[in-house]
Amino acid sequence: MLRKYDRYTPIDDSVEFEATDDSFSFPMRATKLAAGYDLFSTKDEVIRPLDRKLIGTGIKLKKMPEDMQGEIRSRSGLANKYGVFVLNSPGTIDPDYRGELKVLLANMGHLPFDISRGDRIAQILFIKYETPTFNHKSISHYERGEKGFGSTGIGHTETLEEYNE
């Protein structure tokens, strides 16, 4: 049974990890109110400019509640300072996945990016989700129809009067 928690209570007791590598570090929050848990590299790596690399964390999920997912996201400092980010962000970790957590990092910077064993490379957030039941029904007609990207307008108007016209 999942216990109720608030934003100040860590949820690590409802998520269990197992080491796949001797040089692993368990995910940890940098501050008490940090939403994400930092993930660490287990090896020294280099990502060339405009390249990507799958980086191991040395941990795998042993247990996670069925109504929770992990989302692997970029660390803002790496993206801002070096142009290095999680390519498929957020990378979804389903509650039944049992392989090693790996991070797909891309280097959009102009210089090679060096990763040392133990460096913080990404963060993981644990988020509850719901799975809806889908019913087959006819689609109602709406004014918008199948119009998509940009169909409701782009840009901005200069005045409120122009907007209301």
Predicted regions and their residues:
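DUTPase catalytic domain/fold
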Residues: 1-165
